[in-house]
A protein has these predicted regions:
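Active-site rim elements
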Residues: 105-108, 201-207, 263-271, 416
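C-terminal accessory domains and tails appended to enzymatic cores
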Residues: 2-5, 19, 27-38, 143-153, ...
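Short, well-ordered beta-strand segments enriched in hydrophobic/aromatic residues
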Residues: 361-373, 427-433
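Short Gly/Thr/Asp-enriched flexible loops that form oxyanion-binding sites at enzyme active sites
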Residues: 208-221
């Protein structure tokens, strides 16, 4: 949408035209087949006897997996759903309640409404109220919980103004809104329910709560040593699904930008009863479907199949020396999907295109390959979450130019000596002494860059076998 006051220069007009053409092309590619998905078929039996669905907000469990849940329950499979947040900070929905500018009270009312909607939707899918675990954390706070609000002493605050879970219906009322608590909640559910399959959001989703719920789910699974099947689902990724239309006879295909050698896309077929159950469950979320474009968006996920991605942990490249590796001497851990519309010349840069890693006898190298030369104008952060041996630990590194500093963000932070940074054209390399990884078998790695005049650009958190 072009806002009032937008300056329509020739480059801007060209960008709009190019964007429209590219988006149309993406839609055509995504819809090339009609009733059968391009993803590999997966049989219901392959999911096992117990399936755990972890969703960021009430309604995501239906949008991503509603038909699958209905099929599983009908087949006698045990299903449990965890709703991480209360979905209480959606401005447009809260404004409808307030009939104007929403207050903290309006957001709390929205949280209560969406909780009731989630229970009604669960019934439509064949679940019982006891199959739904509503954690009640504040919508929009998961990024803060993962970063600076990890400890109970530094809770996050959302639009409800609460720093503790404010809902009596939550699994743990009055729990501090912090990453440590959320991770423990997920670890407890995984350990107690012992699922054969866990379905969580995809790490490449473009909504922060979705991407960070993916990170928290991975963290919890790695913390408890979960060895079952891990699948992810996509709800928010740019203009996905293609197109935004109610097309129940059309297949759901993977976003073309997320096709990669390290990802296997799987399609679970839905029958008429599954699609009908999903449609009625979506309709229970009246606080969302009443918003015209959102209702259409939700119904666009009622297709002939539901879609899941399977990714194995990445493996870093092992080298015989500790010198800074070249691009060919490192392994790609996370590749940022290319933008649908090319970035205009002169826009805020750099962007992180990929995270690469290599390990020598004494040094772990983490490379952030960017779309422009790395200069001292941006501040990069590199994060590691370490598993195996002792309790999980975290290492947070801030880099400006070639000055690298470890930061103590949480009580489980470590600060090894000898961390340093080097720049090689479009790649920032961070060196971490291998001694800091002693006893660790797996890590999660993520990165971001704060660009001048722009919001931080974040690369997806991915797990790596060490």
């Amino acid at each position: 949408m072009i806002r009032s006051g937008t300056l329509l220069t020739l480059p801007a007009i060209a960008a709009f035209v190019v964007g429209g053409v590219v988006l149309c092309g993406v839609a055509v590619v995504a819809m090339r087949t009609t009733a059968v998905s391009t993803a590999a078929p997966i049989a219901l039996e392959e999911l096992g006897k117990r399936v755990l669905v972890i969703a960021p907000h009430p309604d995501d469990e239906v949008i991503a997996t509603g038909g699958t849940i209905h099929r599983l329950v009908a087949a006698g499979v045990g299903v449990k759903v965890v709703l991480v947040t209360a979905g209480d900070s959606y401005l447009r929905a809260a404004a409808r309640i307030a009939e104007g500018s929403p207050s903290a009270t309006s957001y709390l009312q929205l949280g209560d409404i969406r909780h009731r909607e989630s229970l009604a939707a669960a019934v439509r899918l064949g679940l019982r109220a006891t199959d739904v675990v509503s954690l009640g954390y504040s919508d929009g706070t998961t990024q803060a919980m993962w970063d600076a609000s990890w400890d109970e002493s530094t809770p996050a605050r959302g639009r409800t103004e609460a720093t503790r879970v404010p809902y009596a219906w939550a699994a743990r009322p009055d729990a501090p809104i912090c990453g440590q608590r959320l991770a423990a909640d997920l670890e407890s559910v995984i350990s107690d329910f012992a699922p054969d399959t866990v379905i969580a959001p995809d790490p490449y989703e473009t909504n922060a709560d979705h991407a960070m719920t993916a990170a928290f789910a991975t963290y919890a699974m790695d913390a408890v040593g979960y060895a079952g099947r891990r699948l992810s689902s996509v709800v928010h990724f740019r203009h996905y699904p293609y197109p935004w239309a109610h097309l129940p006879g059309t297949a759901l295909n993977p976003p073309p930008q997320l096709l990669s050698p390290d990802t296997t896309w799987l399609a679970l077929p839905l029958d008429a009863a599954d699609k009908e159950a999903k449609a009625t469950a979506i309709a229970e979320y009246g606080s969302q479907t009443a918003i015209a474009d959102l209702g259409l968006y939700m119904r666009a996920f009622i297709r002939t199949n539901e879609l899941f991605a399977s990714r194995a942990p990445a493996r870093l490249l092992v080298r015989n020396d500790d010198s800074r590796p070249s691009r060919d001497e490192s392994a790609t851990i996370a590749a940022t999907p290319a933008p649908v519309v090319p970035i205009p010349v002169g826009s805020t840069r750099p962007r992180i295109n990929a995270i690469r890693m290599a390990r020598g006898p004494r040094t772990l190298w983490i490379g952030l390959r960017c779309d422009a030369s790395v200069t001292s104008t941006g501040t990069f952060t590199v994060g590691l979450r370490l598993f195996g041996g002792e309790a999980p630990a975290r290492l947070d590194i801030s880099v400006r130019g070639t000055e690298a500093t470890t930061t103590a963000e949480a009580s489980n932070s470590i600060a090894p000596e000898g961390v340093r940074a080097e720049v090689d054209g479009d790649t920032l390399w961070v060196a971490v002494p291998v001694d800091a990884l002693a006893g660790r078998t797996r890590c999660m790695v993520g990165a971001s860059v704060e660009r001048t005049g722009g919001s931080p650009m974040r690369a997806a958190w991915r797990e790596v076998d060490l």
